[in-house]
A protein has these predicted regions:
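Alpha/beta enzyme core
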Residues: 1-171
Length: 171
């Protein structure tokens, strides 16, 4: 596992060189001590629990979290740990709606949902999913508001036809 000094150096570098306004950290109570130290240095931290994109394969792939009582309790413990560590907000990804709703009412930092139902304090949706730009389709909780991927493919196809048919225009 990464040492705290390396964690701090990486976070500072993201802030200074990358121009980040905050650092997102995926995980719960296991990282709370390091998050608390990071916050104490003045670095704002956004927590992230539930589905963790960086470790999705190890967690059994894309699925809902919190459907069994032990897992719901674990998510609650993680959220409280992140709140106590000083996270300014917490992302709840792919969490059972009932669990996310309860959590949003129990913690002070805003709970920002992604695939966790409508009752979180805020919502995130990946722009590529919203615009229909993904090649592999979108997660089940996503409503694509456009289908730009098909439009782009169609436009590129027409362009290729024009090039091959020598129909491109000169000035």
């Amino acid at each position: 596992s990464m040492s705290f000094d390396r964690f701090l150096d990486s976070a500072k570098r993201l802030m200074q060189e990358g121009g980040a306004d905050a650092i997102k950290v995926e995980g719960g109570r296991d990282l709370a001590d390091d998050i608390e130290k990071l916050v104490a240095t003045g670095i704002p931290v956004l927590g992230h629990i539930g589905l963790l994109p960086q470790t999705v394969k190890a967690l059994g792939g894309y699925r809902k979290f919190g459907s069994v009582p032990e897992e719901a309790e674990s998510l609650y413990t993680d959220a409280i740990s992140l709140e106590e560590a000083g996270c300014f907000a917490i992302i709840a990804e792919m969490m059972e709606e009932k669990v996310a709703t309860e959590l949003a009412g129990q913690i002070i930092p805003p709970l920002i949902g992604i695939g966790s139902g409508p009752n979180c304090d805020g919502q995130i949706l990946v722009t590529q999913d919203l615009l229909g730009l993904t090649a592999k389709g979108v997660p089940s909780f996503v409503t694509p508001y456009a289908n730009l991927g098909q439009d782009i493919s169609r436009a590129l196809g027409k362009y290729v036809q024009d090039v091959r048919g020598k129909k491109t225009k000169a000035r």
